Amino acid sequence: MNIISNILIGLIKFYKMVISPYLTPSCRYLPTCSEYTIECLRTYGLVKAISKSTKRIFSCHPIKILGGGEGFDPVNKEFKAKK
């Protein structure tokens, strides 16, 4: 994992500990979008993680016809990034 991925993971953890407790819980997925992003960074690396996480975050809304989703959606670990 590169330094940029580690910085992003640190920022996400900061968000979860400092900012998120003051917001209404709104993630429709399990694991949450922030947990999913951290796992993608650890599994796939920076570029693919950003792509997968962005898609996931944009689908985290209730309107199915516009691509909204919910439920259990873990990171697919079958295709790991080459190291």
Swiss-Prot record:
Q: Is Isomerase one of the keywords?
A: no
Where does the record place it? Cell inner membrane
Q: Which domain of life is it from?
A: Bacteria
Keywords per UniProt: Cell inner membrane, Cell membrane, Membrane
Entry annotated with the keyword Membrane: yes
Q: Write down the membrane topology.
A: Peripheral membrane protein
Q: Which InterPro entries match?
A: Membr_insert_effic_factor_YidD (IPR002696)
Looking up Pfam families in the UniProt record yields:
YidD (PF01809)
- What's an example GO cellular component term for this entry? plasma membrane
SMART domains assigned: Haemolytic
Q: What's this chain's function?
A: Could be involved in insertion of integral membrane proteins into the membrane.
Record family assignment? Belongs to the UPF0161 family.
- Annotated protein name in UniProt: Putative membrane protein insertion efficiency factor
Report the source organism.
Answer: Pelagibacter ubique (strain HTCC1062)
